[in-house]
Amino acid sequence: MATIRNQRFSLLKQPISSILNQHLIDYPTPSNLSYWWGFGSLAGICLVIQIVTGVFLAMHYTPHVDLAFNSVEHIMRDVEGGWLLRYMHANGASMFFIVVYLHTFRGLYYASYSSPREFVWCLGVVIFLLMIVTAFIGYVLPWGQMSFWGATVITSLASAIPVVGDTIVTWLWGGFSVDNATLNRFFSLYHLLPFILVGASLLHLAALHQYGSSNPLGVHSEMDKISFYPYFYVKDLVGWVAFAIFFSIWIFYAPNVLGHPDNYIPANPMSTPPHIVPEWYFLPIYAILRSIPDKAGGVAAIALVFICLLALPFFKDMYVRSSSFRPIYQGIFWLLLADCLLLGWIGCQPVEAPFVTIGQISSIVFFLFFAITPILGRVGRGIPNSYTDETDHT
């Protein structure tokens, strides 16, 4: 028995297995982590689901403007289990964004972006941006009405970039309009970007493990930690089961609710839909874009969203991190969450009064959050940065 045990531990000391053991088994984790810290592993599961289903769908998809729509219908009707693959992939994108949005708002609530985890947060923002680009490209591939016109509207935004804008649009289109060359470009990129996402996710994980996970109290301690396995594997397993049930409800009972009915109409360049709406997870950003009448101003506002997110960790460090001890910031946080939900609703409304005005006010409120956060970070003092720090700062 002792020999078997020694062999087991010697296997964990091998080059590759020792890395896995260090980061997935013996990784020191704060003992007070709540279920809100389980969305990182769920995001990894979503990414794996998207890659696996995407590879199998690509085996039956034809990237040609005359055949793309029919090839998707062929997958749904003729390929055994094709309907399940497509619904898993389409709804999996929505689940991925739900998980990442919750993961991000948890980071905002508990100030997980603060020192020394600035690089972790910045990598997370890059991952979010890559997800948006990948999801947009994937939405174009079925070549329905909303796919075609969404591609036309969104890619044309690049023309607002000074000097090189028109060149970028022509390169994206592969011609003078969205056509077969565009679809082929997007199909190629759609199978490259997920693997870039995997690389960015591994960097995100490595950066996290450099300083360790934060915790609900927002304080640091090297003593109050336990190994990730088996304690948090079991805790994450509860989240995985709940996620599987939630995901299954959408796949089997409401597979098309999160999509748009116009995308079941083949793309027609001669017929513009009455209202061009992106997928629901783009709606808050889309609302900010539409709230500014000028195209260049709208693109600048979108760029400012990501600049604010990237700059957030570099604001002056705060005395108290967790919102549990910052009632003023807590109120501002819930206002931001409500504002993002309102922006999501505005994004799917027609561009007319009063929706434009509401969108402009909501956009201002969104950016005010990032302007106020550095000020609130200096308000309040009474919790040490570490359990072992002196609590008397006088």
From Swiss-Prot:
Transmembrane segments: 39-59, 83-105, 120-140, 186-206, 232-252, 296-316, 328-348, 355-374
Cofactor binding, note field: Binds 2 heme b groups non-covalently.
Residues annotated as binding a ubiquinone: H209
GO cellular component, one term: mitochondrial inner membrane
Assigned keywords, A-Z: Electron transport, Heme, Iron, Membrane, Metal-binding, Mitochondrion, Mitochondrion inner membrane, Respiratory chain, Transmembrane, Transmembrane helix, Transport, Ubiquinone
Residues bound to heme b b562: H89, H191
Subcellular localization, as worded in the UniProt entry: Mitochondrion inner membrane
The keyword Manganese is assigned to this record: no
Chain sites annotated for binding heme b b566: H103, H204
Xref: Gene3D superfamilies: Cytochrome Bc1 Complex, Chain C
Cofactors (names): heme b
Entry's Gene Ontology molecular function annotations: metal ion binding; ubiquinol-cytochrome-c reductase activity
Note: Heme 1 (or BL or b562) is low-potential and absorbs at about 562 nm, and heme 2 (or BH or b566) is high-potential and absorbs at about 566 nm.
Record family assignment: Belongs to the cytochrome b family.
Subunit structure: The main subunits of complex b-c1 are: cytochrome b, cytochrome c1 and the Rieske protein.
The name this protein goes by in its record: Cytochrome b
